[in-house]
């Protein structure tokens, strides 16, 4: 599969994970008090910075034609993992109420 097709596939999957992540973040945020909302926002910003640095590292390491597919895969995988983490957390908070 050409790199451009790999990137397009990863981007489509990441769009799905972005949707799950955003919905889970919204659900979790609605269930928290103001102090916890601020901490959630700080955590999410730190996660985004970490995700970006991790994926930039792969980009720098692979370089050439493999760099862009690798960064697309990295962003997709990281977004999926964070989406599942937030969804699990939101589900747990909902069960406790």
PLM feature spans:
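N-terminal alpha-helical modules
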Residues: 1-97
